[in-house]
Swiss-Prot record:
One of its GO terms (cellular component) is ribosome. Pfam families: Ribosomal_S6 (PF01250). Its main location: plastid. SUPFAM superfamilies: Ribosomal protein S6. This is Small ribosomal subunit protein bS6c. Gene3D superfamilies: 3.30.70.60. Belongs to the bacterial ribosomal protein bS6 family. HAMAP family: Ribosomal_bS6 (MF_00360). InterPro entries: Ribosomal_bS6, Ribosomal_bS6_sf, Ribosomal_S6_plastid/chlpt, Transl_elong_EF1B/ribsomal_bS6. One of its GO terms (molecular function) is structural constituent of ribosome. It is found in: Plastid, Chloroplast. Binds together with bS18 to 16S ribosomal RNA. GO terms for biological process: translation. It comes from Phaeodactylum tricornutum (strain CCAP 1055/1).
Length: 98
């Protein structure tokens, strides 16, 4: 059985999303994660907040938290997908297992 590790990704999206568009974006990204045999996906919307400093001239952003289990070799693929998305201002991947 392959070694699964628990990860958390915090994603900062542009503020242009309304609630339904945000849900659609998250659903599509979660569907993309499932292609890599990701399991135990949970999504938490942290809401829209003011940024401490402008990022690409944006002053607000939507925060999304994704928790899931995956094989370590796929994390690079997830990161590349997020880097190519123009709606993503920043993201950070945490390994939740010590």
């Amino acid at each position: 059985m392959p070694l699964l590790r628990k990860y958390e990704i915090m994603i900062l999206l542009t503020e242009e999303f309304n609630d339904s568009e945000l849900k659609t974006w998250v659903f599509n990204y979660a569907k993309n994660l499932r292609k890599f045999s990701v399991c135990d996906i949970s999504v938490i919307s942290r809401g829209k907040h003011n940024l401490a400093y402008p990022i690409e001239t944006k002053m607000k952003g939507n925060y999304i938290q994704l928790n899931f289990s995956s094989m370590p070799k796929y994390i690079t693929n997830f990161s590349k997908t997020l880097k190519m998305d123009s709606n993503v201002l920043r993201f950070l991947v945490f390994n939740k297992q010590l």
